[in-house]
């Protein structure tokens, strides 16, 4: 059986679309990916492993996938034994702290004693600790931006692309913490095999 390079990618969404565009641009032709978790290439010894983005770092770290394409934000949050081998220049966003509009914001110390909702507690905790801020981190998945509006939190720490979701939820970005984009990752210390076109 032919050895194939297994690439873990996000199974849907913007990162999926842009990753497929990159592979197409590189000349990689895939078979249909409808409802299939493992999709082989028709012209390279490559197969795609379709996963949720937050599962990609673990799949690469454990050797389930040889390499992965995922947002830097997920690499930092999951803190697995992977290394970034190349930034890919697409799916750019940032992780930021945001608070309700019309809030008097004197600076980062505003967050002391406040409750912050996020899906990225590892990154947020490190940022707050590094800056001497003692806040309560409330972990939620999905729809983080509604937390202040329903009284669940005083602020949020979340992904921001255009900022329109913040505006529509009456929030304003006050601290840009990390710039993120799609990156190529491999397990720490792993040596990649040669990949030749069929």
Where are these regions (language model features)?
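Domain-level signature for soluble enzymes in the chorismate/prephenate branch of the shikimate pathway
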Residues: 1-198
């Amino acid at each position: 059986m032919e050895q194939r390079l297994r690439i873990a990618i996000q199974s849907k969404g913007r990162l999926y679309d842009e990753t497929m565009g990159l592979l197409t641009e590189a000349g990689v032709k895939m078979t249909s990916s409808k409802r299939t978790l493992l999709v082989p290439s028709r012209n390279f010894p490559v197969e795609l492993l379709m996963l949720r983005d937050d599962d990609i770092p673990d799949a690469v770290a454990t050797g389930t996938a040889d390499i992965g394409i995922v947002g830097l934000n997920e690499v930092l949050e999951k803190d697995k034994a992977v290394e970034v081998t190349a930034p890919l220049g697409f799916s750019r966003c940032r992780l930021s702290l945001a608070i309700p509009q019309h809030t008097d914001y004197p600076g980062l110390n505003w967050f002391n004693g406040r409750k912050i909702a996020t899906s990225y507690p590892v990154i947020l905790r490190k940022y707050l600790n590094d800056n001497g801020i003692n806040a309560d981190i409330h972990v939620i998945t999905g729809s983080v931006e509604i937390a202040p509006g329903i009284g669940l939190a005083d602020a949020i720490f979340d992904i921001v692309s255009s900022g329109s979701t913040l505006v529509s939820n009456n929030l304003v970005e006050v601290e840009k913490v990390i710039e993120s984009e799609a990156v190529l990752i491999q397990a720490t210390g792993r040596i990649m095999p040669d990949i030749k076109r069929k």
